[in-house]
Amino acid sequence: MEFDSDYTNTIRAELLQKYIIRNMLDYVNIHTFTTTYENNPWEKICFLSLKEYSPSTKTIGYQHAVVTKASANMFISKEEMSYMPMPDKIVTVGGITEGVLRKYGCYPENRIHSSCALRHEYIYRLKKKNFTKNNTILVALEGVYECYKLVNFVFNALSDNKDYRVIIRTHPERPFSKIRNDLCFDIDSHANFSVSNQKPLKDDLSENDILIYWGSTVSLEALMMGIPVIHVSLDDIVNVDPLADCSHLKWTIRNVEELPTAITDVYDMPEHDFLSQYNKARSYIERYLEKVTDDRLSEFIV
């Protein structure tokens, strides 16, 4: 019933986009209409309405976030292309996501263009931290219900090892109060496990040696700062890792027995290997979230 209620309210609001667009055109002429591109219903309604009521308007969809192999909504089939409302141009945050959309979606050749990461300019201001070995580990969670599974995974892997201090950073959508009852342990009874007090992300990252994640985009910031990352694959049907095609300064594990070994491998990494891996990882992130420049901004001009 809750799903039905949410769906009903959502679809009503999205259908209103048609009338918003139509009424707006009574007052202004729209040369170019730019919106986010996540293949949401309301976006399609906007594109369809503009083609109906203002055929001369150019439409741009901005792919503004990460794209994983689990982002099925972003991968259009040949059959869908024949009838699905689409923007005239899709602009991406960088070359990596452009490549993912082209590889897994059946977009026309000239539809997708790589640009820059408008929402992630801050990432270029993050300072590289020294490679530290303080046995402190940050676990970054997403804002989805299943995020508690990662905490349980880490606990089952490290609860017997008191040498490591594990800090859990929750997502604003799923604060610790919402996941506590789903955990397999009482965090107050384990001194080596604690919850971040939601200090700025860069501070949490700076104070830890390693990041453990499932699908969190915090992994991109971590690599930019030179923090090794460990991706936990929680029996995923499809890959939710935003760094699926990056193997630099990154370890991927699938069972609890592998986590202590991965952590040891990180700490045993020679300094020259770390620097080499960091440079390759940073290069990957810079292609994923490309820097804002005048040339790249010109992709928003039709």
Regions found by a protein language model. Name each.
Residues 1-121, 219:
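Active-site and donor-binding regions of nucleotide-sugar-utilizing enzymes
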Residues 42-43, 68-71, 97-101, 122-123, ...:
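Short, charged/polar "capping" segments at the starts of alpha-helices
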Residues 45-51, 104-105, 154, 178-189, ...:
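Short, aromatic/basic amphipathic alpha-helical patches
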Residues 102-114, 183, 217-287:
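Catalytic binding pocket for nucleotide-activated donors in carbohydrate/polymer assembly enzymes
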Residues 107, 112-184:
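Conserved catalytic-core segment of nucleotide-activated headgroup transferases in glycan assembly
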Residues 174-225, 229:
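Donor nucleotide-activated moiety binding/catalytic core segment of transferases
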Residues 286-302:
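C-terminal alpha-helical cap of glycosyltransferases
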